């Protein structure tokens, strides 16, 4: 199967996000790449479901708390930028202070 680099990136994010989701269910704290992948996947999937950019920006701030990530991870992620495909095209979603 031949995939474009962007498609490979999305699959890699999705795979890491699934791992993060499983770890969250077990109560394991997420590291930096897992937290980034988890937030990114939720934004990408919300866009595919027809949500708006504004809804995704708000939703992105509700996904993780400092208690769900390893020490120092929340400080490493002051913002997350995700390029997602919405019904009206591809847009950049920026989430400021995603881990509260």
Swiss-Prot record:
The gene is ureA. Keywords: Cytoplasm, Hydrolase. This is Urease subunit gamma. InterPro entries: Urease_gamma, Urease_gamma/gamma-beta_su, Urease_gamma_sf, Urease_subunit. CDD domains: Urease_gamma (cd00390). GO terms for cellular component: cytoplasm. Pfam families: Urease_gamma. Its main location: cytoplasm. It is an enzyme of class 3 (hydrolase). Its EC number is 3.5.1.5. Pathway: Nitrogen metabolism; urea degradation; CO(2) and NH(3) from urea (urease route): step 1/1. NCBIfam families: PRK13241.1, urease_gam. One of its GO terms (biological process) is urea catabolic process. Belongs to the urease gamma subunit family. It comes from the Bacteria. It comes from Alteromonas mediterranea (strain DSM 17117 / CIP 110805 / LMG 28347 / Deep ecotype). One of its GO terms (molecular function) is urease activity. It is found in: Cytoplasm. Heterotrimer of UreA (gamma), UreB (beta) and UreC (alpha) subunits. Three heterotrimers associate to form the active enzyme. It catalyses: urea + 2 H2O + H(+) = hydrogencarbonate + 2 NH4(+). Gene3D superfamilies: Urease, gamma-like subunit.
């Amino acid at each position: 199967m031949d995939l474009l680099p962007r498609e490979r990136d999305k699959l890699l994010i999705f795979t890491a996000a699934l791992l993060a989701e499983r770890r969250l269910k077990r109560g394991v704290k997420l590291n930096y790449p897992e937290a980034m992948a988890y937030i990114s996947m939720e934004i990408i999937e919300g866009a595919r479901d027809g949500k708006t950019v504004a809804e995704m920006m708000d939703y992105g701030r509700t996904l993780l708390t400092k208690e769900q990530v390893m020490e120092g991870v929340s400080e490493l992620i002051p913002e997350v930028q995700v390029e997602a495909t919405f019904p009206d095209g591809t847009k950049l979603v920026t989430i400021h202070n995603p881990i509260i």
